[in-house]
UniProtKB/Swiss-Prot annotation:
The keyword ATP-binding does not apply. Keywords: Cytoplasm, Developmental protein, Differentiation, DNA-binding, Flowering, Metal-binding, Nucleus, Transcription, Transcription regulation, Zinc, Zinc-finger. This is Squamosa promoter-binding-like protein 3. Induction: Negatively regulated by microRNAs miR156. It comes from Arabidopsis thaliana (Mouse-ear cress). A motif (Bipartite nuclear localization signal) lies at residues 111-127. Residues 1-17 have a biased composition (Basic and acidic residues). Binds 2 Zn(2+) ions per subunit. One of its GO terms (molecular function) is zinc ion binding. Trans-acting factor that binds specifically to the consensus nucleotide sequence 5'-TNCGTACAA-3' of AP1 promoter. Binds specifically to the 5'-GTAC-3' core sequence. Promotes both vegetative phase change and flowering. Regulates phase-specific patterns of leaf epidermal differentiation and flowering time, but does not seem to affect leaf shape.
C-alpha cells in the first residue's frame, strides 16, 4: 500500500469547491433574510406598544412619555401603584410580581404582590435559609 494518493483522489475538483461555495452563499442569504424579517417584526411590535393606553377605565394618562415597563404592561405609573382601580367593572390591583391586575381578594391588606406569588417567594426564602 502506498501512502501517496493520486492528484484526482487527494484534491477536490474546482467544480466541487465552487458548488460548495455557492451553497454556503445561498445559506447565508437565507439566514440574512430571516434575520431581517425577525427584526422587522420586532420593530413593528415596538411601534404599536409605544402608543399604548392605560387599561384602567377612564384613564387619560399620556403613555408616550411613560417608562418602557409601563408601556409594555399598558398601565400608567399612577395606576400601577394605586391601592385599587376599576377594570371591566371590577375592583382590582396591579401585582408587581405578575405584572397583571388581580381582584382585590387575591392580595393581603395593602400589599402590591398577590398571595400566590408571595407564597412562592417566601418558600424560596425558607429553602435558602435551611441550606
Amino acid at each position: 500500500m502506498s501512502m501517496r494518493r493520486s492528484k484526482a483522489e487527494g484534491k477536490r475538483s474546482l467544480r466541487e469547491l465552487s458548488e460548495e461555495e455557492e451553497e454556503e452563499e445561498e445559506t447565508e442569504d437565507e439566514d440574512t433574510f430571516e434575520e431581517e424579517e425577525a427584526l422587522e417584526k420586532k420593530q413593528k411590535g415596538k411601534a404599536t406598544s409605544s402608543s399604548g393606553v392605560c387599561q384602567v377605565e377612564s384613564c387619560t394618562a399620556d403613555m408616550s412619555k411613560a417608562k418602557q415597563y409601563h408601556k409594555r404592561h399598558k398601565v400608567c405609573q399612577f395606576h400601577a401603584k394605586a391601592p385599587h382601580v376599576r377594570i371591566s367593572g371590577l375592583h382590582q390591583r396591579f401585582c408587581q410580581q405578575c405584572s397583571r391586575f388581580h381582584a382585590l381578594s387575591e392580595f393581603d391588606e395593602a400589599k402590591r404582590s398577590c398571595r400566590r406569588r408571595l407564597a412562592g417567594h417566601n418558600e424560596r426564602r425558607r429553602k435558602s435559609t435551611t441550606d
